[in-house]
A protein has these predicted regions:
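Solvent-exposed soluble domains appended to multi-pass membrane proteins
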Residues: 1-321
Length: 321
């Protein structure tokens, strides 16, 4: 996704951003959807969505409930203190409150946390004004602070009874300002990390194959050995036979990245194709008018678009009895 309001549905409900308008604010947001929370609820899990921002921002509170969360906790529930004057509660304060709230939850539980301090205007608490390097862009200091805040969360969390029985998933909702040409391309503007961590259970490994936010839901549910059917537009990243791709939509153009190619499609015709592993800046369009070399990617993208449009229009974004 390229916006927070698109990233949240992709991460928690495996809903790609394939419309001009974000799903949360679209006419279809009242339809039934499934999510990590809704599926886990059917398996005995309590769920809560924590948002360091002001209640109502981007409709996250309403979306959390429509996605099946039992509770939503925003700045209103946190209280008026520790406000950054713009978005919400400073990360290091909200992290601690988040962890303490989990201490009172009956296991098993599933929580989601959306933090705010690494967002423009990149405010850092006064007490940390000279602690972190400032760099050439204001975001760099705020990223250093956000990293520190995450560190303090894990320092506290590792002492809690739920820590060793928890799968942590860390990712971004979207990219920030770029500093190099690589991250200004139609591939680079989507490049974010996804980290899966479970103390003592997952061995350290770096995987540079294609993944997307929509893969998080099927990966988490697969890891937990959930067998019931659900609707998702991604794949289980822990399954070596899973097909890897990343689909997106921007400025009237659909895009799909596979392990071999990045293709762009206007809904009728293939527009461009790049061998992105060898052409990181996407300088050489290898599409010469013949779709044949790219049929695997093109057919996958068409299938995703068809399924998404059909399910959105017909309220079929969840498995119903």
């Amino acid at each position: 996704s390229k916006k927070s309001i698109e990233g949240v549905p992709a991460v928690i409900a495996s809903l790609p951003a394939l419309m001009e308008e974000p799903f949360i604010t679209s006419p279809y947001n009242g339809g039934k959807i499934n999510s990590i929370a809704s599926v886990l609820k059917e398996n005995g899990y309590y769920s809560a969505f924590f948002h360091g921002g002001n209640n109502g921002t981007m409709g996250f509170d309403n979306f959390a409930f429509s996605a099946g969360y039992d509770n939503y906790f925003g700045r209103h529930e946190y209280g008026p203190h520790d406000y950054d004057g713009h978005w919400g509660v400073y990360d290091h304060k909200f992290y601690r409150w988040f962890a303490e709230k989990m201490n009172g939850m009956k296991q098993p539980f599933f929580t989601t946390l959306f933090t705010i301090s690494s967002h423009h205007p990149f405010k850092v608490p006064d007490e940390f004004k000279d602690k972190f390097p400032k760099g050439d862009h204001p975001i760099l200091e705020s990223i250093a602070y956000a990293d520190y805040a995450l560190h303090t969360f894990f320092e506290y969390a590792q002492k809690q009874p739920w820590y060793h029985n928890t799968l942590f998933v860390i990712t971004a909702d979207h990219t920030g300002p770029s500093f190099t040409a690589k991250y200004e391309t139609r591939k680079g503007i989507y490049e974010i990390p996804i980290l899966f961590f479970m103390p003592g259970k997952l061995q350290p490994k770096e995987d540079n194959s294609v993944a997307q936010q929509c893969d998080i839901m099927p990966t988490v549910l697969g890891f937990l050995n959930i067998k019931q059917p659900f609707v998702a537009f991604g794949n289980n990243l822990f399954n070596p036979s899973s097909k890897r791709f990343a689909a997106s939509f921007l400025q009237d153009t659909y895009q799909l990245i596979s392990d071999d190619y990045l293709i762009q499609f206007d809904g009728t015709h293939l527009l461009n194709a790049y061998r992105w592993r060898k052409d990181d800046l996407l300088l050489t369009n290898v599409f010469n008018g013949d779709d044949t070399p790219f049929l695997n990617e093109l057919n996958t993208l068409k299938a995703i678009i068809q399924q998404f449009n059909h399910r959105v229009l017909n309220n079929r974004l969840a498995v119903t009895p």
